[in-house]
Amino acid sequence: MSKDGLISGLKNRILQNIARNAPGATSLRVTLHRWRGVKIGKGVWIGYDAIIETSHPDYVTIKDGASVGIRAVIIAHFRELKGVVIEEDASVGPGAIIMPNVTIGRGSVVTAGSVVTKSVSAMTVVQGNPAKPIARVGVPLKLDVSLREFSQKLRPLGKI
C-alpha cells in the first residue's frame, strides 16, 4: 500500500469512527460521511452507530430524503466492488444489513434487523434474513409522515 493510500485509509477510518458517535443525524453525522466520500443527497437522516462501508465509502449512494437506522450496516464490497444505492425516501431500519450490489428502491422500507441480499423494488417493505417483500408502501415513511398514516396505507402481499 502506498503512503497516500495509507493516509487516505486512516482518514476514512477516523472519520467513520467519529461519525458513528457524532451528534446530528441530519447534520454533523451526514457531513462526516460526505467527507469520507459517501454520496449523500439532501434531507438524509443517519442514525447513531450506523456503519457505512468502511473501505470504499465512494461506492455508497444515499439519495434525498432517505434514512439509515441506528446500528444499520451498509457493505458495498466483499471481494469485488459492487456498490449500494439507497433511493429517495427509502428507509433502512435499525440493525439492518445491506449487502453489496443492492439498490433499495424509492420509498421502500427495510425492517429492523433484516439482511438485504437482493435489490428491493420501489415502494416495497422487506423483512427477514434474507429479506423478502411483505407489503407495498402507500406513502413513503418520511420524517413528516406519522407511523399511523404509514401503516394505514400499507398493502400486505399475502403469504410469503
Model-derived segments and their meaning:
Residues 1-37, 42-43, 107, 124, ...:
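Terminal amphipathic alpha-helical/low-complexity segments used for targeting or macromolecular assembly
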